[in-house]
Amino acid sequence: MLNNRNVLLCVSGGIAVYKACALTSKLVQAGANVKVIMTESACRFVSPLTFQALSRHEVYTDTFKEQNPSVISHIDAADWADLIIVAPATANVIGKLANGIADDMLTTTLLAATAPVWIAPAMNVHMYDHPAVKRNISVLYQDGYCFIEPSEGYLACGYVGKGRLEEPENIVKLAEKHFAEETSAPLEGKHVVITAGPTREAIDPVRFFTNKSTGKMGYALAEAAVQLGARVILISGPVSLDQPKGLAEFIPVQSAADMREAVLSVYDASDIVIKTAAVADFTPKTVFDHKMKKQDGGMTLELKRTVDILKELGEKKKEQILVGFAAETQDIEHYARKKLAAKNLDLIVANDVKANGAGFGADTNIVTIFFKDGHKRELPIMSKLDVSFEILQEIAALSKQTGERS
């Protein structure tokens, strides 16, 4: 239930406004305190009086109409909200938000918001597929907004396709799940080890070779795991990120050998190990004591294989849940499932690093989770922190099942 949760519903101008009326009613029935902001266009479809009657609060329609002279309306509304839902969100309002435009009560309030913002698009199927709209949605994902994907069906314009505002009862369920997860700690008492970032393999005192990993996915997982109640040890290669707050231990490493040593030192005491680090497969056979000087002609650098840490953990595994990552460029499912089986993993998270919004350094990701029992779960583009929560919820469920069987 949503007892005493403050939900700010922002309604922009589209035919789906009628569904926003039902959403207001269902949120109130679930126990939420609901306030509504309407754009000028939204008021052309439904009277503000309708939302006032359903929410039992006066409706915001004008930035310059200060309902309470002791506060500034758009700041007060933003501070009041525990959750903000923009439904329906038109292409116009999505474009404004993506570009920081604040020219009405809705957009001005969202610029001042610190609560989570969910955007529920509703528009013609071709508008939703337009490159400009997709670009704006991608920007908002990177800014930390969450999206409630539109459903497919008959649209008011006569087309059949993706663009229908999600059903109000489903949005309410998502809100209930959000607040339930916020107050729960499904990983409480669990010892979680997460590896992140690249490794550096020294050639000489000046040079090394590495990879494009930035550590963002691993650090997001560590942050989320702490929030879900876990005791988190983060083992990180060299990155330019701040340590997540609340870690039990932070272990910085440089090379693949360092990473292996650190992981093995904490493995036996762990309940869950998540290996997001991009560990080098090869390292120089000889590390030069002094800087190598330029020479005429070419140069041959002899390499040797590093130890496959994930495979070694799979062989040593007792009751731990072992999670791997697969950053691929082709045949994603084939290589992910092969790695899942070969390394005795419980699940593996795979992505196509060439896809827009899913590569190294991006703040978003598009992943598929493959499970040991053969099923998979595809996630849409979302922030790496949101991806982390989804992954960890799956791990928590798996941990619970494992505990019930043992």
UniProtKB/Swiss-Prot annotation:
In the N-terminal section; belongs to the HFCD (homo-oligomeric flavin containing Cys decarboxylase) superfamily. This is Coenzyme A biosynthesis bifunctional protein CoaBC. Its EC number is 4.1.1.36, 6.3.2.5. Pathway: Cofactor biosynthesis; coenzyme A biosynthesis; CoA from (R)-pantothenate: step 2/5; Cofactor biosynthesis; coenzyme A biosynthesis; CoA from (R)-pantothenate: step 3/5. The gene is coaBC. It catalyses: N-[(R)-4-phosphopantothenoyl]-L-cysteine + H(+) = (R)-4'-phosphopantetheine + CO2; (R)-4'-phosphopantothenate + L-cysteine + CTP = N-[(R)-4-phosphopantothenoyl]-L-cysteine + CMP + diphosphate + H(+). InterPro entries: CoaB-like_sf (IPR035929), CoaBC (IPR005252), DNA/pantothenate-metab_flavo_C (IPR007085), Flavin_trans-like (IPR036551), Flavoprotein (IPR003382). GO terms for cellular component: phosphopantothenoylcysteine decarboxylase complex. GO terms for biological process: coenzyme A biosynthetic process; pantothenate catabolic process. Residues 192-406 are annotated as: Phosphopantothenate--cysteine ligase. Its cofactor is Mg(2+); FMN. The active site is at residue 157. SUPFAM superfamilies: CoaB-like, Homo-oligomeric flavin-containing Cys decarboxylases, HFCD. Pfam families: DFP (PF04127), Flavoprotein (PF02441). Disulfide bonds: none annotated. Binds 1 FMN per subunit.
